[in-house]
């Protein structure tokens, strides 16, 4: 299903801090980039057509509209930190500069999903946790530092070459349309509220 992320047009990025996460979110996708740090639990991670086990620590970056989910055990003290930022970042002119080319390649690679080595996860864990405690302009510097460190680290592409993100989105949209049509057909004799139909497909009224 499609997620409407809380990032606004005024945000360069947002940090979502979830101590004792419930891991009850279904497989979903959204138009933003995402860095997800999962700590102190174990379970199964789904990214596109990749399904892998993780244990204690996981760090993954996903690109726009790439379906993903973590099915973790609800272990006391588990912690999830998510950094989300707009897909428009890839079009920033600064990424055309030579020093930013590793970050641009990281963004391109993330469209297939990226996981990182244990050494990278351990190093980035502290930087990402530090970001959750920072405020103001210094958060921007730390965010760019995180992107650069990830861009120069060894990484593993998760999704197979055969996987088609656009096809997955088309299928998802078709299912939503079918669900809406079915609802209207069953309730056409009653007043139909926009909010009820939007909620049926997990969308806000404005997005619907």
Regions found by a protein language model. Give the residues of each.
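Short hydrophobic/aromatic patch on the recognition helix
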Residues: 57, 207-208
């Amino acid at each position: 299903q499609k997620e409407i992320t809380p990032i606004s047009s005024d945000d360069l990025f947002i940090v979502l801090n979830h101590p004792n996460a419930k891991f009850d979110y279904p497989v979903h996708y959204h138009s933003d980039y995402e860095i997800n740090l999962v700590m102190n639990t174990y379970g199964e991670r789904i990214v596109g057509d990749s399904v892998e086990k993780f244990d204690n620590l996981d760090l993954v970056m996903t690109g726009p509209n790439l379906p993903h989910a973590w099915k973790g055990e609800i272990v006391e003290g588990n912690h999830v930190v998510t950094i989300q930022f707009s897909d428009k970042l890839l079009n920033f002119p600064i990424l055309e500069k030579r020093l930013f080319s590793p970050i641009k390649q990281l963004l391109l690679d993330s469209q297939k999903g990226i996981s990182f080595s244990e050494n990278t996860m351990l190093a980035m864990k502290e930087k990402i946790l530090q970001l959750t405690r920072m405020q103001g302009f210094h958060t921007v510097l730390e965010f760019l530092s995180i992107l650069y460190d990830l861009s120069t680290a060894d990484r593993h592409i998760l999704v197979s070459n055969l996987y088609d993100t656009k096809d997955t989105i088309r299928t998802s949209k078709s299912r939503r349309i079918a669900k809406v049509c079915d609802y209207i057909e069953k309730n056409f004799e009653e007043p139909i509220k926009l909010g009820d139909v939007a909620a049926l497909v997990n969308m806000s009224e404005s997005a619907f």
